[in-house]
């Protein structure tokens, strides 16, 4: 009878640990989602808001894939997205969202629930920052890996935003913009 009592105590302790770990995990996931939302740069929406706004306003989408440890991503936030000309072009043509390529926050992507990590993997993103331009229905228009200076980024935003990308190469178009 003594052995059975010990097994009951062990089972209760294990059950308690399972419940504790489960609660901790769900708390971490909701904290991660809140952090993702509160850490948005000025002018950026959440992933879902970006697609909703893009459809409603008939604008393109800019997804900025980043990681928390990426120095160039932080520099992009600090030096590029704060630039007035970048903000003007973004507001005119795009809805933008930041996507943490290592996060486990889930979104609907191509009709399926996927984490930000899975979305980044599906889009072939291996370096950060990487900028993905999309139509409101999720079709990729352009993929730009790496840091882009504000003056160049303003031109890229105008090139894609005006639809010039449909008929011209960027370098040829850029020469006509002086």
Regions inferred by a protein language model and the residue ranges of each:
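Structural alpha/beta surface segment adjacent to cysteine/selenocysteine redox centers
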Residues: 89, 93, 99-126
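Active-site-proximal beta-strand/loop segments in catalytic clefts of secreted hydrolases
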Residues: 65-66, 99-102, 134-136, 146-147
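A short beta-strand-turn-helix
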Residues: 43-60, 90
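Non-catalytic, surface beta->alpha helical segment in thiol-disulfide oxidoreductase systems
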Residues: 79-81, 121-166
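Typically the conserved alpha-helix immediately C-terminal to a functionally engaged Cys/Sec
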Residues: 72-91
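Short active-site neighborhood of thiol/selenol oxidoreductases, capturing the structured segment around
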Residues: 56-71, 96
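N-terminal targeting signals for export/organelle localization
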Residues: 1-40, 178
């Amino acid at each position: 009878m003594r052995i059975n009592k010990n097994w009951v105590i062990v089972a209760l302790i294990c059950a308690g640990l399972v419940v504790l770990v489960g609660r901790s995990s769900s708390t971490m996931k909701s904290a991660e989602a809140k952090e993702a939302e509160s850490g948005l740069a000025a002018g950026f929406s959440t992933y879902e808001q970006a697609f909703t706004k893009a459809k409603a306003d008939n604008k393109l989408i800019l997804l900025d894939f980043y990681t928390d440890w990426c120095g160039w991503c932080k520099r992009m936030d600090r030096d590029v997205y704060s630039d007035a000309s970048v903000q003007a072009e973004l507001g005119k043509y795009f809805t933008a969202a930041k996507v943490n390529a290592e996060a486990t926050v889930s979104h609907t992507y191509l009709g399926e629930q996927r984490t930000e990590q899975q979305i980044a993997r599906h889009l072939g993103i291996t370096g950060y920052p990487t900028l993905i331009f999309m139509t409101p229905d999720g079709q990729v228009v352009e993929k730009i890996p790496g840091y882009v200076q504000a003056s160049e980024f303003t031109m890229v935003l105008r090139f894609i935003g005006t639809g010039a990308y449909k008929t011209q190469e960027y370098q040829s178009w850029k020469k006509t913009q002086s």
